[in-house]
Amino acid sequence: MSASTSTSTAASQDACYISLLGLAEYFRTSQPPNIKKCIQCLQALFTFMPPSKVEARTHLQMGQILMAYTKNIDLARQHLEKAWSISEPLPNFDVKFDTASLLAQLHLQTDRNSHQAKAMLRRAVELSQNNVYWHCKLLLQLSQIHASDREYSLASELLAVGAESADEASATYLKVLFLLSRAMILMIERKTNDVLALLNSAGQIIDNNIPNPHQKEYLKVFFLVLQVCYYLALGQVKTVKPSLKQLQMSIQTIMAPNWPSDEAIFGANQLEMFVWLPKEQLYVLVYLVTVSHSMMAGYMDKAQKYTEKALTQIEKLKQQEDKPILSVFKVILLEHIVMCRMVMGNRELAIREIAAARDVCMAAPQRSLLRRHSAQLHCLIGLYSMSTNLFEHAERQFVVCVSETSERDLKLFANLNLAIIYLRTKRDTDLKQILDAVSTENTHTYSSQALMGGFYYVQGLHAFHKNSFHEAKRFLRETLKMANAEDLNRLTSCSLVLLSHVFLSIGNSKESMNMVTPAMQLASKIPDIHVQLWGSAILKDLHRMSKDVQHEKDAYANHVKYSENLIADQRKCVQSAHHELVNWFQGDPPVTSGPPAVPVLLMPESSVTASVPVIASTSAAMQPAGQYGQFY
């Protein structure tokens, strides 16, 4: 064959490739898309025996189309594996990286574990060292998988490598993304000092070395979300306020109508084509951390208002595109609203929303959300069971929570609630054992100020029940000191009402009144029906002692009102189909459509153990500020 004939044949083949690719794209973008004909066009390319690079790219495109538009995962895998085997040895050919990234995603969808996905990405990371964009993208993808598997040290190491690679390429924006992502992992690991150092370093770069004002604002939102979560994890509700206010202002700036699209901000430079979350999702996340703050500060009305706004926004986004992270946000918000309902005495609504959270978890592919949130759901059902006097069920729920979770704050929270159960059921040996264990485990380790305040509160409650009033006062004053320092209003109100009861028990009616009055004011502001029930009983006794008949009548009337509200709500709980969830201890939670099966006491407790402070735990991996539960 002459050179001219060979050239003519090659040109003719190129024209065929281009025509078939153009036709395939035409069918793909038709309304509606004609995927069958699109695939036929791509398949036809192979009949021309194309060069290796064209063949590999076509196999990649086939894999992409099959994954995006069909359920034929096996065929998609075959094409992607073929693309990988052809492209892997070819130098300076990006198709291998795109293929590895997609194959890893496919392995995560279909395999029981992530070993193959990790192996594929590790190989691609090795091959991509001369391509900064793909090297960084693959490092982020691999670190995300390790983080999802709770292999935080490995995730952190990969993110550190990414920060170095971005730094060597003078990609400052990308470097800050890696630094902040690593700070998020270290926060989950409770490496408090390392988190602070990274946040300080990233903050200085954002302030001084990011010239693009739009990218700067995005990084600022990421930075402030982490800073707010850091303070909330420490239980520092008062300290966090300036950062939270700044975050709320920044998100308003980003959501303004004149703000450019994400594509316009991040589309110009390949090394800036990385976004932590699109602005619409950031908007929901800011609502979420605001809800977290309101819950911890004891502003239930605010928490409910922001939760409802966030859930509305999530539903709008789901209608556009149902991203998995929206379900994560929804579950965390539902966990918060459940806690609000129980503090306010709306337990029937709480169990309904626990069921809603269960439904979101069950709908996620491969039960991934249920695995991550099962312990939290058991904890919430434990709180619900406590509030309806089902102590045996509550105990089993908390024990399951402790056995399932690796989150130390959630474990501490569940154990403190177990201590309350043992106190109320007079199991002194179990109570002593759990308090000793909690004390030993948390003496020399980092814990939330709110949680540690709750620990002192439980010890004060225990001392009160032993009639060790001096010891009770000592523990409760320590609790008050911690609560007042950070505006933990519910912890404050519960401590004040218990202190009031301590003083009442030793006959000091003046100090008792001095404690119960601000407790009731705070409880009304929260509002916390359990503290109000308890406080009204104390006020009734105090007014009777001082022979103030009218105020005694008023206090008694209030006490009856709170009691009747709780009794009416408990009747609704018993009648709710979702009440059956109290019997879920293992496996998948039941679908609650049948009649309730558990008999429940209808008389609410008004004893001093009926209400204990809200304590918030920390987030699950890669999900900032996921908070769990309150004591009862």
UniProtKB/Swiss-Prot annotation:
Record key words, sorted: Cell cycle, Cell division, Chromosome partition, Mitosis, Nucleus, Repeat, TPR repeat
Family named by the database record: Belongs to the SCC4/mau-2 family.
A Gene Ontology cellular-component term: nucleus
Annotated compartments: Nucleus, Nucleoplasm
UniProt subunit comment: Interacts with Nipped-B to form the cohesin loading complex.
Pfam family, one: Cohesin_load
Name of the protein this chain belongs to: MAU2 chromatid cohesion factor homolog
Major subcellular site: nucleus
Keyword Magnesium listed: no
Lineage per the UniProt record: Eukaryota, Metazoa, Ecdysozoa, Arthropoda, Hexapoda
Biological process annotations from GO: cell division; chromosome segregation; maintenance of mitotic sister chromatid cohesion
Gene3D superfamilies to which the protein is assigned, alphabetical: Tetratricopeptide repeat domain
Coiled-coil ranges (or none): none
InterPro entries: MAU2, TPR-like_helical_dom_sf
TPR repeat ranges, renumbered to this chain: 453-486, 493-526
Origin species: Drosophila sechellia (Fruit fly)
Stated role: Required for association of the cohesin complex with chromatin during interphase. Plays a role in sister chromatid cohesion and normal progression through prometaphase.
